[in-house]
Amino acid sequence: MKTKFFLYFFLLPIMLFPQLNPQSKKLTKKFFPDPNIEINTPAFNKKKGFTKYDEMMSFLNEQIANHSDVVKLEFVGESQKGKQIPMLFFDRKNSNEKVKVFFQAGLHGNEPASTEGILYFIDQILNNEKYNNLLDRITLAIIPMANIDGYEINNRYASNGLDLNRDHTKLLAKESKCLKQAFSDFEAEVSVDFH
């Protein structure tokens, strides 16, 4: 009885107080200012909404056309609804031994920030002079949207209802098999799930 009393009347107010007293705009502006950067991805170049598959493909094809010396596109398979799953390879040919790094984004269709973030990352690697020498040291493989069908309808799951993030061992979804094969073929030394 004393424990319940303690929980209800002591801990509960402590947990609720921050909800009733939100952070001031002054503090937010001081410690979390808007970044002073230009984001050249499809979602940030339109009025609302996230990047759609067709917009992403146009963006990727434009990047490839402008940087064909360092990036190429392959399709590693199809989604359950027949959309091609893109994988980009970034490499500057030189004699250096390089670390192979694999990025995967958009595994959960209702988490669009991962695809938006990876598109920004792609733009920065190819267009920001600060990162010019990065491809002298690493070879990148990037799948920017793994769960295309789920992403298109803002749904966490693939078309067959599976969570692709829970299907790495059973490989029941068509997309999971494609992702596994692409990852294995690339022989990455570092893997990042841009989640």
What label would you give each PLM region?
Residues 4-5, 16-195:
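M14 metallocarboxypeptidase catalytic domain recognition
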